[in-house]
């Protein structure tokens, strides 16, 4: 029995690990590598394992950095099932097809200049048909349902509190009369956040593979964060500019809408035009509405009293390209919620092009920004940014609001790890190097756990 560490070992994106036992091979996540172009190009490299030799895929949640290479895996020969939680299965239906559509468009765009330069044309990483082929293999499971997926291999999903359908995965591997329990954290959510439940309590494991996105940081107090959002909205109104909110289509968008509705009167939002300009986020929000049994207690009560749910009276959904382009004619008084969250593509890039050089405009960044992304350059206060090949001076006001992260901070991570009553070996992944190192040191000093930081391709015999 062994674990092989591959994706999200040298950074945050591209989650991907292998478990081997009883002659079977299990793939934990198959995520897209995101960031700078040279990082994204790694997605085209061959997998460090043979896709046709994988017996089953176990997916923690739908975010593309965890699921985004599943169509490529199937395209290259994988034939087995893809297990995940039911809500994640529904979210993947829209996420993977959207990702494939973007890959097709990116290839078309690049091939235009390649053709002019008489360079070889490229193929998209995968197509919508490839995504649909992968989706046919998805098997949805309920939380807390223990399932034998292969001889001697059982799994059980627990709520990770990160996004709808996100999971911690308990995995039991049995071989030659020995059983080892592996717990894969997936992405952990914060405690005491709206809509979703807290991360589940798991008390026993032999090995824990745990994320560390914010393994060296504490998030700002949530109440202070809500106050800050109100101040940003007020400031943007005073400057008579637009307010752009780049947001992940799954999770962050729904939380932003929840707060805008809850504080509609307090933040005087009746003076704004509010646009949800993301077809993916619009469809995802409808899926959120279909899973009220996964909400936390407060959201469940509000959902049962549907007329009392926080809502935005002036919210406008803009699914069509024509509606989206029309927003760019508005120079002030618009709150524009759009994707992608890291500003690596999608409609938000077009809105940035029209607003980033306006002094009265405000850009509120409410999620993690990976190294090399356009969003990270704004967070790092770069004086200019390149959009569609052209440099734009950054004159808009940039606000980084950290308290809304869907990821656990260091205190949340330590709280979750503190639930283990035995002393599992811990393997820290899914973080920048300094975050992984800081978290592993805290685990060793505060919880006296044997914590390591595996590198790409490292193998651990169980």
Language-model region placement:
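Pre-active-site segment of Zn-dependent metallo-hydrolases
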Residues: 9-11, 21-80, 84-136, 188-197, ...
